[in-house]
Regions:
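Acidic, metal-coordinating catalytic segment for phosphate/diphosphate chemistry
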Residues: 1-11, 16-17, 28
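Short hydrophobic/aromatic beta-strand or adjacent loop that forms the aromatic wall/cage
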Residues: 7-11, 88-92, 130
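Active-site-adjacent beta-strand/loop module that shapes the phosphate/pyrophosphate-binding cleft
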Residues: 18, 78-103, 113, 117, ...
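Conserved Nudix-box catalytic region and its N-terminal flanking loop in Nudix hydrolases
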Residues: 19-60, 65, 156-161
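Short, solvent-exposed aromatic-acidic interface loops
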Residues: 25-29, 79, 110-111
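A short coil-to-beta-strand element that immediately follows conserved catalytic motifs
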Residues: 66-77
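NUDIX/MutT-family hydrolases
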Residues: 104-135, 158-161
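Charged phosphate-binding loop/patch that engages nucleotide di/tri-phosphates or the phosphate backbone
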Residues: 136-161
Length: 161
């Protein structure tokens, strides 16, 4: 029986020159010592109907980057996974970092590092993020579609919407 508890999260993967900025998150109770998106976190009250608002807040809080420093900000993936007694919904955005003043932004959540698109194999990542990144590198980076992913113990199945 499922309790009906939800955990909604949003994250962004910043892109520049065929690289993605990843964060090695440290000291977090939910996700720690794993490579994740450039910035992200849980929805706060008032953000339940707006994943973009959540993402922009987290981006500014964690990296001090505003929407003005971005181009092509787009929701590309939504995943769902039941884990630890709650339904986890992840909203994954991608954007181009266009501000030339921002090189490798420091994060309040851990260590940031740029990775070549072909250099992320084997990096430890959260379960759905690993499958999402693999799908993005194989398929998603070549189109503008929105994908939904349903996770089970064996992986994540993606479908374009």
């Amino acid at each position: 029986m499922h309790s009906g508890k939800l955990r909604s999260m949003a994250s962004v993967y910043l892109r520049r020159d065929n690289q993605l900025l990843l964060l090695y998150r440290q000291g977090n109770s939910i996700v720690s010592n794993l490579w994740i998106g450039s910035a992200g976190g849980h929805f706060e009250e008032g953000e339940v109907k707006d994943a973009r608002q959540c993402l922009l807040r987290e981006l500014y809080e964690e990296l001090a980057i505003s929407e003005a420093s971005l181009a092509n900000l787009s929701l590309r993936y939504v995943t769902m996974r039941y884990a630890d007694g709650e339904l986890r919904q992840n909203y994954y955005f991608f954007a181009d970092l266009i501000d030339p003043e921002v090189m490798t932004p420091a994060s309040t959540e851990g260590i940031t590092k740029w990775f070549a698109l072909n250099g992320m194999d084997g990096l430890p990542m959260p379960f759905t993020a690993r499958f999402m990144i693999d799908h993005y590198l194989r398929t998603g980076q070549y189109n503008d579609l929105l994908y939904a992913g349903i996770a089970n113990d064996s992986g994540v199945q993606f479908q374009s919407l």
